[in-house]
Amino acid sequence: MSLPRYPGEGPRDLSKPLEQVRVLVDARTAGQRLDLALAAVLTWRSRSSIARMIEQGMVRLQGRVVPPSRKVRVGDTIEVDIPQDPVAQPNQDARFDVPILYEDECMIAVDKPPGMAVHPSGRHLHGTLIHELHRRYRRPDEPDYDVVQRLLHRIDMETSGVVAVGLDEQFHHQVRKQFEDRLVQKGYLAVVHGRPVDDEGVVDRGIVPDKASAVRLKLTTCEPGSGQSAVTNYRVVRSNDRFSLVELRPETGRTHQIRVHMAAIGCPLVGDKLYGADEQLFLQGIAGELDDAGRDALVLDRHALHSSSLTFFHPRKGRDVTIEAPLPHEFADLMA
């Protein structure tokens, strides 16, 4: 979160929640409605939320409470009292079946198991990570402790490992911006078929829809400079006669990026129904028609991709934080 500094004010202490903002109106926002002018500054809040703050007297223009429609002028001072988020106090009596890797008043990071969706959508309306977190943090009868969880990033349902979730609106905005600006270091581990030609390398290939596929959501690679740019760094950790354990660090965050890139270099992920040897396995799986031969070909009942680490700047701690998830036992079994 980057706010314009009011003349004469020192740098803000990021280790504390933001309690008040003062804005000096300049030529860029002059003539706008008050709510629109504030929306350009309080970017983590919706316009309707800002309008409510104005109507509740939490915003003052030149020291006076005015309606959201009031036009602002060059040199006006806007003062905003920022409502504080509820305090995160986990319900210790609630069942929580996901391993916790890190937790503080601003966030929680968990080791998501494979097969769990991160949020409700489509066919997955129950049993998601968000449902689990609601049991731990939501307290509708105690507004001061009723915390809304906000995902900082997402991983596929079949992918296991680190998922970070914000428990504070300001914190979520600050860290989410790091993801958008590609400042977060994301590490993955995958078990792939075979062994890459080079033990270490970079896959720099754009990603586009695979028009030759019967599966609408399937993607494929193209030459650099076309499609969505995508870059993945990889390093072979160890190999046996069938598989390789590969460490991956994507520089971009495209849909299915690691799976597409590993398939493109001839080493698809173990268990990958869509980007493995036969996409018919994906269609059979969707239809519930996957037979024993298909399951044997896949080796695993999910694709072998694991979100192993996440490093980002924690604005309240004032330092980088690294969160790690241990190697899944099924990966270790494949590499034994």
Where do the protein language model's features map onto the residues?
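RNA pseudouridine synthases
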Residues: 1-336
